[in-house]
Amino acid sequence: MKPTDLAFDTVRAVLWDGTSLKLLDQRRLPRETVYLDIPDVGAAADAIREMVVRGAPAIGITAAYGVVLAARRLPADTPDWLDALTPDLERLAASRPTAVNLFWALARMKSVIGQVGADLPARLEAEARRIHEDDLADNRRMGELGAALMDPAEAVLTHCNTGSLATGGYGTALGVIRSAYGQQRIKKVYADETRPWLQGARLTAWELVQDGIPVDLICEGAAASLMRSGRVGWVVVGADRIAANGDTANKIGTYALAVLARHHGVRFMVVAPTSTIDMDTPDGAGIPIEERPVSEVLGLAGQPVAAEGAGAWNPAFDVTPAELIDAIVTEKGVVERPDRAKMTALMK
C-alpha cells in the first residue's frame, strides 16, 4: 500500500465488527452522515432494494454479510442449512436484478453452505470478510492499472458514484481517479449530477470533498460542451454488469457519455472487478435492466417537479456497446478495445 492510498481514501459505506452490520445511509448524504444498524437478512435485502447501499460491489458485500446474519438466527443443529437458508438467499437475489456482483457473492456464500463442516456461521463470516477485503485490495490494484493509462491531463469526467461509497473501499472508477490524482496525472474531477438519484451531486462530489480532491459538478447536458473544450482527457466510469463481449451495463446516462466521448476524441474507460463480468451473458441484449418508480423522475428531493398528469420512463441502467469502450480495467489486467476473444482470454 502506498501513502497516496491512505491520503485520499477516508470513506467507508459498509462496516462489520464481527457481530453487527452497519450501512452508511446514502439516501441522506450529503446533508447527514448516518449509519443504520442492519439486524437481520430482511433488513439487508431492504437496504439494497431501497438504495441505502448501492454500487455493485457494495451490494455484493452487503448481501454476503446478510447471509451471515441469516445463518446466525438458526439453531446450531439445523439439519439442512441450505434448505433453511434458501428463502433468504432468494430474497437477497431479488433485491437488485442488474448488479451481477450480488449473484456472484451469493454464489460464493452458497458454496460455503454446501461444504461439510462444523460452525457454519463462523465459516460464512470468514467468507464474507474475504469478499470485503479482496474487493478493497482489487480496487487499489485497478487504481494503479487505470492511472497508468492516463497521460497528464487537466481533468477527467465521471458518472454516478463508483468510489468507497459503492465498494468495500477506495472505489473502482474513483479508485483510478484517486490514484491518478495522487500521482499528479490529473488536477481535478468533473462529476455529472446523475439524475434521477443525483449520485454524482450527492455522493461523488461529497466523497471527493472528504478526501480533498478538487471536483466540479456539471449537469449531464453540459458534458458535450465540456468534452469539446478539451479539458477532459478521459471519461472514467464503473459497471454493474459486463457481458462476455465487453458490452457494459452501468448507470443510466453512461451510454450517452460514451457516444459523446467517441465523437469528441475523448477516451472512455470502464473500471470493474472481474466479479462484475458475466461470461454467461453473450452481449448487452441479455442484461436485465431494472426499471424504477416513475416518481423518481417526476419529483426531486421528495417534491413534485413535473406537470400533474405527466408520465415518465425510468430505466436505472443502460448498456454501452463494447465498440465505444477504449479500455476495461480489472484487477487481473486491462482489456483495450474489448471484444469477446479478449474478454475470454482475461477470464481464463
From Swiss-Prot:
Substrate binds at R54, G55, A56, R96, Q199, N250, K251. Disulfide bonds: none annotated. Keywords: Amino-acid biosynthesis, Isomerase, Methionine biosynthesis. The record marks C160 as: Transition state stabilizer. It comes from the Bacteria. GO terms for biological process: L-methionine salvage from methylthioadenosine. Pfam families: IF-2B (PF01008). Catalyzes the interconversion of methylthioribose-1-phosphate (MTR-1-P) into methylthioribulose-1-phosphate (MTRu-1-P). The keyword Endoplasmic reticulum does not apply. Gene3D superfamilies: translation initiation factor eif-2b, domain 1, Translation initiation factor eif-2b, domain 2. The keyword Lipid metabolism does not apply. The active site is at D240 (proton donor). Pathway: Amino-acid biosynthesis; L-methionine biosynthesis via salvage pathway; L-methionine from S-methyl-5-thio-alpha-D-ribose 1-phosphate: step 1/6. It comes from Thioalkalivibrio sulfidiphilus (strain HL-EbGR7). It catalyses: 5-(methylsulfanyl)-alpha-D-ribose 1-phosphate = 5-(methylsulfanyl)-D-ribulose 1-phosphate. This is Methylthioribose-1-phosphate isomerase. Belongs to the eIF-2B alpha/beta/delta subunits family. MtnA subfamily.
